[in-house]
């Protein structure tokens, strides 16, 4: 009688570590909810062209494992490993969880381009302006309005009507309004406060003529710039609001202002928006996940390649089998 052999236990398949094609190659992860977004696709193309291995990971598909001495990120049932550097592309709608994921990566000792603290500071318009002002960076006069009793004094302090009204959270020109009268301001503020929003009032810089300058900073360099002009009947110059962009060659003053703003906020990649005032450039916003389709189109520059090259420079040296 033949002896029965016990069925062998199936061993879980091991994920093979992807071989790096050269000593200079790096394993790059881009945190992005949508792999088809222009900026995400361009980063993937630029990494491939330079011989790096790039993986796109959905931020919201990451699980956070908190354990003393062994922090981990879980993705599709497995711990994320063998990462040399991460480029976070965190959308405004998922800022809270996105910051937690980036902070977890920092706790794992993985270089990130940008860090959680830098992203958090730049996402809050008031906090960002506070940091910039503390570092001597020129910004528009700004007051936070808490209730209607503060409004008249706030308007006086920022230079009078018209005045810019902004939500402290918001991107792509969303939540930015202009008010020409007390009636307009009162109506806007009451509506926003009823919705639980926090509001800042900001001086209107007439000489900017419904245009601004976007300078992209990578590392410690201003690598590209464009002037954005609002479409007719609109004062917001954001490309997402229908503004038009054209290549701009910034002066040394503008470059130093943009690089200084990024450095003050701790951003290694930043879209710095500046208004041209009579007293010189003033920073109105810093974007920690700047889109660059408009900038590449206006300038012909390989912005994605510059970002990937900087990511590779700050990456940790990979372990090799």
Description of each model-found segment:
Residues 60-82, 92-98:
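Glycine-rich, highly charged phosphate/nucleotide-binding loops
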Residues 2, 22-48, 54, 65, ...:
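Active-site nucleotide/adenylate-binding loops and adjacent lid/helix of ATP-dependent enzymes
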Residues 91-93, 168-170, 289:
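Short glycine-rich anion-binding loops that position phosphate/pyrophosphate groups of nucleotides
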Residues 3-4, 263, 276-321:
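C-terminal active-site "lid" helix and adjoining low-complexity regulatory extension at the edge
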